[in-house]
C-alpha cells in the first residue's frame, strides 16, 4: 500500500493520501533557527538549542498525535464552514488534502469547498525568521467571503520547565499586540522575545491560547474560528499563541497571497522583518534555498539501473545526512529536546561521511570533537561544544531558564564514563576530510584538549590510537569500557571484538596519513601496532565460521557456535572484513554467516537468535524485548557496514541484495508494513521475532543515513577520494551493464561512465580520462571538467 510518491524532478515527496500510519516528518531551517514538522503541520520551531530555546510548543507521544503545530484555518464567512489547509487539526475528508516534503521546506495543499489553498513553511536564509507563505484561489463560480486564521502555541524556552514546572512557566510569560505584531515575552530572560506578524494589517488577533480555543475544545474546533471573529486577547502570564485574522473577498478565479512571519525579537524586530520580507523577498529567499540544495546535490549525482538507489543518492540520502551533520540527534518527534549536545561517536561518523558536500561544517564538527578529547585519549561521550569555546561575558542576572554556565571541573568525566569506540571514529573522519579537501595543513592545526593543554590534530590522533592500544584485556582484545558502539551490549566491561577491529581500521587510515606527511617513523611504529592487533584478533576472535562478538569480564566468549542466543552478531563480522583484519577465506565465511542468520527482506538483523534470558554479564541487550532495537531488530546503522564488507570481498550482487532490503525508497509500496517515511532511513526496523516485524521507527536522526551514503558511493559504486587522486573500484551486480557518476572534487568535475561488458561484479580493466589511460583520477586544476571511461573486467 502506498500513501505517496517521489517527485524527483522537483526533489519532493508527495503525500497524496494524508492518513499515513504515523507522522511523516521533515526539517526546515539551515542555521540557528530550525524546526521539525509533519505532514499535517504538527511540530515545533526552536532557536539554537532544542532544550533552552524552544519557540513553539509540542506535546510528544500524545493523542491526537503530534501537535500542536503551525496551522492556517480557512472559514467561509457565509456558511460558517471551516477547515485547515494542512488537513489537521480540523480533519475534513482527507481526499481534499496533500503535502509535499521538500528539501528544508514543506508545502501543504487543500482543495476544499471550491477554494484552492497552499501553505508553505521555510526559514529565511539570513535571519531567524520562519516564513508562512499562504496562497488562496477561488475556484468556484461565486464570490467568496473568507476569513484566514493562523495558530501557533508559544513555548516556555526551557523544555523541561515548559512540560513540568507550571508554577513557574505559566507566570513568567506574557504577550501584547501593537501595530500588527504579536509579541511573546519570556520575562525571565533579558532577550526572551519572539514576534509573529504578517505582510498586511490584520482584522483581528488573539495571543491567549485559552481565549482562542475556548473551554472544553481543542485545535480541531477553536471557538474563535467557529465564531468567525478574534477577541483581541493578551495578558501577562498564562499560555500564549499567535493568531492573526485576515478577512477576504475573492471573486471567481481570483487569487491572493499572504505572508506570516515568526521570528526572534520583540515588536521592533517584528516591524523591521515585516518591512524586509516582502513577497518579492520571500520569493528570493526561497529561490536561494533551492539553489543551496542544488549546490549540495550537484557534488555527486548518479545514474544506475537501480531507481531506488538513484532516488536516495541523488536526493534524500544526502539530505538526511546533511540534516544530521547540522542538527545532530536531539530535535525530532522522538528526541524532543530534553537532552542536547553532541554524541561523540555519532558526530564523528556524520562528519566522516559527507565532507564533499559540506566540508566547512564537517571540519567544524571535527574541531569540536578534538576539543572534547582528553589528553588520555578518550572522548567525552556527550558534550556541548560551547563548553570548550572562549569564555563568554556572564549575563547580568541569574535566570533558571537560560543555558547554564558549565562548571568546567565537572564536565570532563573519567575513564568510567568513556565509551571505547568514541574517539576511534574521529581518526578516520579526519583522514576522510583531508582526502576530500587536500588540506594537509589541517593535520598541523593546534587544538586544545578537554582537560587542558593543547596539541596538533595529528597529536590528538596519536593519543586516540595509543589509548586503545593501552586499554586491552587479558586476551589482548580492546576493552569495551562503558560500551562500544552498541550501548546495550557492554559485556560487563569485558573485551570488544568490534573495538579491536575499529582500532585496526583507524590505525590503517592514520598510517596512510602519516606517510603522506612524511612521518615515516610514526608510520613504521603504528604499522607494528596494527600488525599486532590483527594477529591477536585473528587468533582470539575467530570461531571457525564467524567472528565472536566479544568476551565478558568473566572471560566468557559471546557470539560463538556454542551459544543458543546471540550466536551471530553483525558488528564483529562486518568489521572483521571492513577493518582489513579478516583474510579472504575468513571474510567469505563470516559474511555467509551474516547472510544465513541475519538477513531479512527488510535488512540485516543486529544479532540472532534474539536474547530471551536476562544476563547482565552480557548487557542490557538481554533485557530488550526480542525483535526490538538492539535485540534482534534490523538496526539500520550497521547495515551499510555489511555492504562495505561484501564490496571488499567482491560480491556486488550480495551487497546490492543487502542494500535493497534496507532502502527506504524501495519500500514505498509496502507502507502497511513499514509505516514510517519512505524517504528517510530509520533507526531500526522491527525484527522477525516480534509481532510488528517490518515496522520502521525513528526517522532522520540516525547515523545509518551517512553510512548508507558512504558505503553506496565509496564501496559499491567505488568512487573513493584519496590524498593524490580518486580511486575507481566498483563492486556491482553482474547484470549491471553500465552506470554513471558525476563527482565534484577539489574544484574539478569528473564525469565517470562505467561499463561492464564481461558481466563481472568487481575488477577494473581500464580507466581512460579524456582519451588518456590512467591508474586513478588525478587532482585537476580548479574549473576543469573531464570525461572518464571505466571498463570493468
Give residue spans per PLM region.
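Anionic coordination/interaction segments
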Residues: 1-346, 359-372, 398-405, 432-436, ...
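Catalytic cores of carbohydrate-active enzymes
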Residues: 149-151, 166, 380-382, 502-618, ...
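Extended, well-ordered alpha-helical scaffold segments
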Residues: 272-278, 288, 312, 358-371, ...
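Carbohydrate-binding/catalytic loop surfaces
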Residues: 332-340, 382-418, 450-456, 477-496, ...
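Aromatic-rich carbohydrate-recognition surfaces in CAZymes
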Residues: 342-347, 351-476, 497-504, 632-655, ...
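Surface beta-strand/loop "capping" patches
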Residues: 721-754
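Short strand-turn-strand beta-turns centered on an Asx-Gly dipeptide
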Residues: 768-772
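C-terminal beta-strand-rich structural cap/linker in extracellular carbohydrate-active enzymes
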Residues: 778-793
Amino acid at each position: 500500500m502506498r500513501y505517496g510518491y517521489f517527485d524527483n524532478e522537483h526533489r519532493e515527496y508527495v503525500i497524496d493520501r494524508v492518513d499515513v500510519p504515523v507522522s511523516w516528518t521533515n526539517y526546515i531551517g539551515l542555521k540557528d533557527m530550525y524546526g521539525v514538522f509533519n505532514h499535517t503541520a504538527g511540530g515545533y520551531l526552536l532557536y539554537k538549542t532544542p532544550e533552552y530555546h524552544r519557540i513553539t510548543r509540542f506535546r510528544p507521544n500524545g493523542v491526537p498525535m503530534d501537535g500542536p503545530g503551525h496551522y492556517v484555518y480557512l472559514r467561509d464567512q457565509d456558511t460558517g464552514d471551516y477547515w485547515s489547509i494542512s488537513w489537521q487539526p480540523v480533519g475534513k475528508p482527507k481526499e481534499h488534502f496533500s503535502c509535499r516534503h521538500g528539501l528544508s521546506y514543506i508545502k501543504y495543499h487543500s482543495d476544499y469547498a471550491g477554494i484552492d489553498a497552499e501553505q508553505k513553511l521555510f526559514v529565511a536564509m539570513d535571519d531567524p525568521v520562519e516564513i508562512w507563505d499562504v496562497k488562496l484561489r477561488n475556484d468556484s463560480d461565486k464570490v467568496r467571503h473568507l476569513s484566514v486564521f493562523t495558530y501557533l502555541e508559544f513555548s516556555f524556552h526551557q523544555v523541561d520547565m515548559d512540560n513540568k514546572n507550571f508554577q513557574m512557566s505559566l507566570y513568567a510569560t506574557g504577550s501584547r499586540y501593537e501595530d500588527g505584531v504579536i509579541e511573546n515575552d519570556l520575562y525571565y530572560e533579558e532577550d526572551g522575545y519572539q514576534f509573529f506578524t504578517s505582510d498586511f494589517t490584520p482584522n483581528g488577533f488573539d495571543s491567549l491560547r485559552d481565549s482562542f480555543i475556548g473551554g472544553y475544545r481543542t485545535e480541531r474546533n477553536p471557538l474563535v474560528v467557529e465564531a468567525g471573529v478574534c477577541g483581541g486577547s493578551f495578558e501577562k502570564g498564562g499560555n500564549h499563541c499567535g493568531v492573526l485574522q485576515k478577512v477576504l473577498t475573492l471573486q471567481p478565479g481570483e487569487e491572493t497571497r499572504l505572508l506570516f512571519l515568526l521570528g526572534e525579537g520583540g515588536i521592533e524586530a517584528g516591524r523591521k522583518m515585516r518591512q524586509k520580507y516582502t513577497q518579492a523577498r520571500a520569493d528570493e529567499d526561497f529561490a536561494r534555498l533551492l539553489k543551496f540544495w542544488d549546490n549540495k546535490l550537484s557534488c555527486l549525482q548518479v545514474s544506475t539501473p537501480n531507481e531506488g538507489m538513484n532516488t536516495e543518492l541523488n536526493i534524500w540520502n544526502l539530505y538526511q545526512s546533511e540534516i544530521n551533520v547540522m542538527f545532530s540527534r536531539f530535535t525530532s518527534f522522538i528526541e524532543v529536546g530534553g537532552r542536547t549536545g553532541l554524541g561523540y561517536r555519532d558526530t564523528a561518523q556524520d562528519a566522516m561521511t559527507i565532507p564533499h558536500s559540506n566540508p566547512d561544517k564537517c571540519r567544524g564538527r571535527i574541531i569540536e570533537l578534538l576539543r572534547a578529547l582528553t589528553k588520555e585519549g578518550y572522548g567525552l561521550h556527550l558534550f556541548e561544544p560551547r563548553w570548550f569555546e572562549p569564555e563568554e561575558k556572564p549575563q547580568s542576572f541569574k535566570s533558571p531558564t537560560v543555558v547554564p554556565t558549565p562548571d568546567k571541573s565537572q564536565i570532563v568525566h573519567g575513564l568510567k564514563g568513556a565509551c571505547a569506540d568514541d574517539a576511534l571514529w574521529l581518526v578516520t573522519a579526519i583522514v576522510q576530510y583531508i582526502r576530500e579537501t587536500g588540506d594537509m595543513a589541517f593535520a598541523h592545526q593546534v587544538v586544545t584538549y578537554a582537560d587542558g593543554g593543547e596539541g596538533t590534530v595529528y597529536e590528538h590522533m596519536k593519543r586516540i590510537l595509543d589509548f586503545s592500544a593501552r586499554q586491552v584485556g587479558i586476551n589482548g582484545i580492546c576493552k569495551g569500557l562503558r560500551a562500544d558502539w552498541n550501548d546495550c551490549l557492554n559485556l560487563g566491561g569485558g573485551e570488544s571484538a568490534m573495538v579491536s577491529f575499529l582500532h585496526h581500521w583507524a590505525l590503517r587510515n592514520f598510517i596512510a596519513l602519516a606517510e603522506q606527511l612524511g612521518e615515516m617513523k610514526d608510520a613504521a611504529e603504528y604499522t607494528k601496532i596494527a600488525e599486532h592487533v590483527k594477529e591477536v584478533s585473528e587468533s582470539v576472535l575467530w570461531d571457525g565460521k564467524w567472528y565472536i562478538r566479544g568476551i565478558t569480564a568473566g572471560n566468557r566468549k559471546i557470539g560463538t557456535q556454542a551459544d543458543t542466543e546471540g550466536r551471530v552478531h553483525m558488528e564483529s563480522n562486518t568489521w572483521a572484513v571492513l577493518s582489513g583484519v579478516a583474510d579472504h577465506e575468513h571474510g567469505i565465511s563470516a559474511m555467509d554467516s551474516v547472510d544465513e542468520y541475519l538477513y531479512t527482506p527488510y535488512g540485516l538483523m543486529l544479532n540472532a537468535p534474539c536474547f530471551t534470558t536476562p544476563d547482565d554479564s552480557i548487557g542490557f541487550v538481554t533485557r530488550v524485548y526480542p525483535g526490538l532495537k538492539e535485540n534482534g531488530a534490523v538496526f539500520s546503522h550497521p547495515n551499510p557496514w555489511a555492504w562495505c564488507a561484501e564490496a571488499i570481498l567482491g560480491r556486488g550482487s550480495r551487497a546490492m541484495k543487502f542494500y535493497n532490503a534496507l532502502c527506504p525508497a524501495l519500500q514505498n509500496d509496502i507502507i502497511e508494513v513499514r509505516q514510517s517515511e519512505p524517504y528517510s532511513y530509520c533507526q531500526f526496523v522491527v525484527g522477525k521475532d516480534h509481532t510488528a516485524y517490518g515496522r520502521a521507527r525513528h526517522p532522520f536522526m540516525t547515523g545509518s543515513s551517512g553510512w548508507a551514503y558512504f558505503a553506496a558511493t565509496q564501496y559499491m559504486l567505488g568512487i573513493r577520494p584519496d590524498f593524490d587522486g580518486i580511486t575507481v573500484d566498483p563492486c556491482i551486480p553482474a547484470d549491471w551493464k553500465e552506470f554513471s557518476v558525476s563527482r565534484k572534487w577539489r574544484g574539478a568535475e569528473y564525469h565517470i561512465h562505467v561499463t561492464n561488458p564481461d558481466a563481472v561484479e568487481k575488477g577494473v580493466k581500464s580507466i581512460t580520462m579524456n582519451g588518456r589511460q590512467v591508474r586513478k583520477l588525478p587532482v585537476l586544476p580548479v574549473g576543469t571538467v573531464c570525461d572518464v571511461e571505466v571498463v570493468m573486467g
